[in-house]
Swiss-Prot record:
Disulfide bonds: 21-75, 22-37, 25-71, 27-35, 45-52, 49-64, 54-62
This protein's GO CC annotations: extracellular region
Pro-piece positions: 1-7
Keywords of this entry: Disulfide bond, Protease inhibitor, Serine protease inhibitor
Lineage of the species this protein comes from: Eukaryota, Viridiplantae, Streptophyta, Embryophyta, Tracheophyta
Alphabetized PROSITE patterns for the sequence: BOWMAN_BIRK
Pfam families per record: Bowman-Birk_leg
Stretch forming the signal peptide: none
Protein name: Bowman-Birk type proteinase inhibitor C-II
Record-annotated site: Reactive bond for trypsin and chymotrypsin: 56-57
Molecular-function GO terms, alphabetical: serine-type endopeptidase inhibitor activity
Source organism per UniProt: Glycine max
Length: 83
């Protein structure tokens, strides 16, 4: 099965979406935890991502493949939540 993924140059964008953040972070229960961000971004990954994979579609759908021991701050502000 071909995934049709390629590495993206995520460093070319300085807009809000390039800031490291993650809305869908999943971590293992191990110590230290192994965390992955499952967010999909258009055309690039956030600025702190070392391994970015994007589909060949236009616009590209990109996901950071890095493993960290923490989750980045959420991308969406808490003001957007309906409490």
């Amino acid at each position: 099965m071909e995934l049709n993924l390629f590495k993206s140059d995520h460093s070319s964008s300085d807009d809000e979406s390039s800031k490291p953040c993650c809305d869908l972070c999943m971590c293992t229960a191990s110590m230290p935890p192994q965390c992955h961000c499952a967010d999909i971004r258009l055309n690039s990954c956030h600025s702190a991502c070392d391994r970015c994979a994007c589909t060949r579609s236009m616009p590209g759908q990109c996901r950071c493949l890095d493993t960290t021991d923490f989750c980045y701050k959420p991308c969406k502000s808490s003001d957007e939540d309906d409490d």
